[in-house]
Design a protein with these regions (language model features):
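Catalytic cores of the polymerase beta-like nucleotidyltransferase superfamily
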Residues: 3-242
Length: 242
């Protein structure tokens, strides 16, 4: 059982989890697995309201299209589909994958579909965002993320220096999660954030604006926000916020 007090009496959460279990049953009947993942599982463990449901499967987009009706396939070439259940619950379904070759400091140049969660989790950013949940609502954790969440610790999966060089926007995501969930930033991650802060110049203003606006809109501790913004001279980035 999770160590968190999960609010299963919450009717909205119940409805969404039941919709997931129903959808997972459909996948199983066709020989595939479906798991909830990332922020959906993190928020479930924290007892927070669930938004759209993020899920992963060992089925490819083409395989999913063969048995699941009314799916949106705009990003199928990237391994991602959108689906709305009969109950109106929205799911983002991504095929398990491995990513490599971040040539533009943002997007992988190579995506390879895989079958194993122990491979898929390595492409994710932070341990608290790399948790999976199966159809029985059992947590699957390959990187001690549940324990890090319990201990209010934000850690990068893999080498923080390399992962931030892949995508410098992870610096701002780390700041956002630090503030949103009161997570202490791991020393190695914090050092890598400072070392590579200048790489944010390679990210578009629109992407930076989006992350900063998410931070701005959160109900966060004022002193924590003031401290972390001062550490990283966020004021120089705030000029892109409209």
């Amino acid at each position: 059982m999770p160590f968190f007090l999960v609010l299963l009496h919450n009717s909205d959460m119940d409805q969404k989890l039941l919709a997931f279990q129903k959808l997972a049953s459909t996948f199983k009947s066709h020989g595939y697995h479906l798991y909830l993942v990332g922020g959906t599982v993190r928020d479930y463990l924290l007892g927070k309201e669930l938004d759209d449901m993020d899920a992963v499967s060992d089925a490819t987009p083409k395989e999913i299209e063969s048995f699941l009706p009314n799916i949106e396939t705009t990003f199928a070439y990237l391994g991602s589909l959108k689906y709305k259940s009969e109950e109106g619950i929205k799911f983002d379904i991504t095929t398990l994958r491995k990513e490599s070759g971040y040539l533009d400091n943002r997007h992988p140049s190579q995506i390879t579909f895989v079958k194993d969660l122990s491979v898929d989790y390595r492409r994710r950013d932070f341990t608290v965002n790399a948790l999976y949940m199966d159809a029985d609502l059992k947590i699957i954790d390959h990187c001690n993320g549940e324990n890090d969440l319990k201990n209010h610790l934000l850690k990068m999966i893999g080498d923080p220096e390399a992962r931030i060089k892949e995508d410098p926007l992870r610096i701002l995501r780390a700041i956002r999660f630090h503030l949103m969930f009161n997570l202490e930033i791991d020393d190695a991650l914090l050092k890598a954030m400072h070392n590579n802060f200048s790489l944010l110049k390679n990210i578009t203003d629109a992407k930076i604006r989006s992350e900063l606006n998410k931070i701005k809109d959160e109900q966060v501790d004022v002193e924590m926000k003031k401290d972390i913004f001062a550490q990283f001279d966020i004021a120089n980035l705030q000029g892109v916020i409209k």
